[in-house]
Amino acid sequence: MAGYNLEAIEAAPLKDDLDIVIPTIRSLDFLEQWRPFLHHYHLIIVQDGDPSIKIRVPEGYDYELYNRNDINRILGPRANCISYKDGGCRCFGFMVSKKKYIYTIDDDCFVAKDPSGKDINVIAQHIKNLETPSTPHYFNTLYDPFRDGTDFVRGYPFSLREGVQTAISHGLWLNIPDYDAPTQLVKPRERNTRYVDAVMTIPKRVLYPMCGMNLAFNRELVGPAMYFGLMGEGQPISRYDDMWAGWAAKVVCDHLGFGVKTGLPYLWHSKASNPFVNLKKEHKGLHWQEDMVPFFQNLRLSKESDTAAKCYMEISNMTKEKLTKVDPYFEKLADAMVVWIEAWEELNPPVKKKQSDGKDVKAK
């Protein structure tokens, strides 16, 4: 697409602008296979579970490693907003990062190959997705018009062809599908072998089930909305952390005028989790999602919510107002959402800019 040098975007690793966040409870030997693509980048590793267990990181990586003791030390009483024994702990890494972009990956994911047999560079594709516009207001039947070899089709309004800034790039996976427990039980041997060479913008006012295992986003645009909820040990629900963040962040993107892409890149998901354990973690969520999804579908934010943080505070208020009748847990979740924003703003104070008279004002 004219005006966007896709080769330059792919060639530029943006290593000074992107952090890789990895939640883990085990050895990070999987990083050996990722070395050709990830070794240039700074890693933020969030160790879940027992902080006395030593996590081994392969040599040569530049990283910070945080365990639960570190989270408690840094956040103090606000640490209770970070999930324990749940992949949602990764959002602590989003909070302490200072980079423009975040890429988060699970520790059971490996490099996949495209149909030609070439290793897939997930970072390059995510950066390409994030650095080119989204088209949420009108669907292009050739999918992403900013990819090489495609464009806007006949009938696409010229007034909408500029697109909007992309905030989220949602990648996919080969091999083990990201299924809920009932589907896992019905299809225990099913594998995803279909490689679809496509990137598309999720239309405005349309939700999607966001998976955190292969995800990149613009932290400056939507970082405060990427809260993976209060789940795991001590909570009645788990395995909905990424979906909660995805629903909320999509509402924020729609309100603020940003876009969300899904599709390429693929990675290889190697390890199927136990469906019986998952069923115990998910069983309330499987019922509650019938209320959570309509809640987010019907959310409309006020014009006063002009930043991701303000949007998220408003969503917190509506969560308490609308979802507490489903279960008292949602009041606790809504309170944790407020604490999350307070902690975010403590570690990431709003940047001040100068007015014409030289006085400081908070940047929006």
From Swiss-Prot:
Keywords, comma-separated and alphabetical: Cell wall biogenesis/degradation, Cytoplasm, Glycoprotein, Golgi apparatus, Isomerase
Pfam families per the UniProt record, alphabetical: RGP
GO molecular function: intramolecular transferase activity
Keyword Isomerase on entry: yes
Entry keyword annotation includes Glycoprotein: yes
Family statement: Belongs to the RGP family.
Record comment regarding domains: The conserved DXD motif is involved in enzyme activity.
Protein name (Swiss-Prot/TrEMBL): Probable UDP-arabinopyranose mutase 4
Organism expressing this protein natively: Arabidopsis thaliana
